[in-house]
Curated annotation (Swiss-Prot):
This is NADH-quinone oxidoreductase subunit B 1. [4Fe-4S] cluster binds at residues 37-38, 102, 132. It is an enzyme of class 7 (translocase). Keywords: 4Fe-4S, Cell inner membrane, Cell membrane, Iron, Iron-sulfur, Membrane, Metal-binding, NAD, Quinone, Translocase, Transport, Ubiquinone. It comes from Chromobacterium violaceum (strain ATCC 12472 / DSM 30191 / JCM 1249 / CCUG 213 / NBRC 12614 / NCIMB 9131 / NCTC 9757 / MK). The gene is nuoB1. Belongs to the complex I 20 kDa subunit family. Transmembrane segments: none annotated. One of its GO terms (biological process) is electron transport coupled proton transport.
Length: 158
């Protein structure tokens, strides 16, 4: 957690930033935005074998209850405004994981007229998970990388 010091009376000192970021990493609530075959792997990661609950990741049905969006699959032009609307409804601070080649850059359908060439053109992306489709382990690694990124951010403005 980034313990600053341990005093002789049994007290531990740390900064407010490190404490807040530590608690945020243990309670990521993703809003699932499954668009294609990558969503199946995302569901696989949430099932019993990989059990994202042990990392504090609990899938939420509403954008107002979530702070993480996992964009999994091909994003078409008609779906892009809905993606942005859901992102805007999420509570601050919010993070985005782009899962799969199609969400990262269009993937197999990159040259199609109806496909957005990367969801980072619509919403800011924090972590990219490569693969077609990426495995559940890759998504798990992406979530761990996001947790490490959250621990390094400053939460209190100076």
């Amino acid at each position: 957690m980034g313990v600053e010091g341990i005093l002789e009376k049994g007290f531990v000192t740390t900064t407010a930033d490190k404490l807040i970021n530590y608690t945020r990493t243990g309670s990521l609530w993703p809003m699932t935005f499954g668009l294609a075959c990558c969503a199946v792997e995302m569901m696989h990661a949430g099932a019993a074998r990989y059990d994202l609950d042990r990392f504090g990741v609990v899938f939420r049905p509403s954008p107002r209850q979530s702070d993480l969006m996992i964009v999994a699959g091909t994003l078409c032009n008609k779906m892009a405004p809905a993606l942005r609307k859901v992102y805007d409804q999420m509570a601050e601070p919010r993070w985005v994981i782009s899962m799969g080649s199609c969400a990262n850059g269009g993937g197999y359908y990159h040259y199609s007229y109806s496909v957005v060439r990367g969801c980072d053109r619509i919403v800011p992306v924090d972590v990219y998970v490569p693969g077609c489709p990426p495995t559940a382990e890759a998504l798990l690694y992406g979530i761990i990388q996001l947790q490490n990124k959250i621990k390094r951010t400053n939460t209190i403005a100076r």
